[in-house]
Amino acid sequence: LIQEDLPFIKSENKINNKKIKFKLPSVDLLKIPTQKDKEKIRDDDYIDSEFLEKILLDFGVSGNIKKVSHGPVVTLNEFEPAAGVKVSKIINLSDDIARNTSSESARIATIPGRSTIGIELPNSSRENVYLSEIFSNNDFTKKDVRLPIALGKNISGIPVVGDLASMPHLLIAGTTGSGKSVCINTIILSLLYRHTPDKCKFILIDPKMLELSTYEGIPHLLCPVITEAKKAASVLGWVVKEMENRYRLMTKEGVRNIDSYNAKHILAMPYIVVVVDEMSDLMLVAGKEIENYIQKLSQMARAAGIHIIMATQRPSVDVITGTIKANFPTRISFQVTSKIDSRTILGEQGAEQLLGKGDMLYMSSANRIVRIHAPFVSDNEIEKVNNYLRSQAEPDYIDEILNFADEKELSGETSNSGDKDELYQAALDIIRSEGKASTSFLQRKLQIGYNRAARIID
């Protein structure tokens, strides 16, 4: 395998002159919070801790509230139950606590490493979380975080930044209006703010045709935004092929991962981030094929610098299969409709008690679940950033990706027709020799499905 033959190196040579001048976007393109936004929420917006203790006592649960943490959206009350009180008894009181405190919902969960139980109650007025605040934080600009993504603020109001390189893949679920699409936009913008087109490339798959089309034409794209589900399966096939090429190249160079390779070479191998906005649409069209590709990529692509971000609004078992779940240890759940959906995505209930509009539960690869409030980014802000990027460079699409998709479809059609002709002749021979002709007879003899046997009989 010759190094220069790899697609990412071919494209590097073409835009070599342009990449030197490339400037990363400024935080000024995003909305900066004003002093009014930063003002503290009034004290009467919170539930009094003594009142909460009294409510619990009315239900036969005695104990004390040890600590209260006021966040931008919810307040965390750390409750220490008296000896002999079961945790399950307190968790089952979530609906009663919400009713007695006149709250929209109440989430109760154990706090790892502490003897207290967290009771999360929503504030009567929500504080806005802006993307510019997270980008200005020191955690986002750290050099050792290779692919930083702005997740939002935790319950205490502290900015949370994740590293996609260590995740290494991300699964997002949530109903319509829960903030799922805004979260995908903040993740894409996070990477656009940190990496030039020669360091990080994107493949965007958007069967809904609306959410990711705004990124069309930015220089970070490897191919135009994919909107057809059949083409998406073929593009994922190309990503698998690219991963195998990278593995061969790294084996030849004697390195173990993309970072070691880039440390040895001037021509950096870019990260590839594949974003799939609606997984259920793809699973309907080509479920088994997509699942096989995603399984391959999620198991092996990390070392090759390829990462997948998948989102779905239907977190049922037929979309998020056991195979997909096993290979996506890092997951985000926004508000879902039922406890069953919450268990499917996180393995425990609680996501049905979320408030919507960016309120999420983040499960890291260590299986710790943290409540985070995702930042809001408007369409206007996204468009400003995209226009700034488009003004600096043209996208350098790799034709091989779309050609790969077209070739695969053509070869699929020819092979299907070839199979049919071959079986048709075999079916004729069997019918002549046996003197019988029926669909079920052909199914048994040729070991094929009902539909195919019926077509041959017709």
Question: Over which residues does each language-model region extend?
Answer:
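Short, intrinsically disordered, mixed-charge
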Residues: 54-58, 95-103, 189, 193, ...
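Short, charged, solvent-exposed linker or helix-capping segments at domain edges/interfaces
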Residues: 129-133, 173-174, 383-387
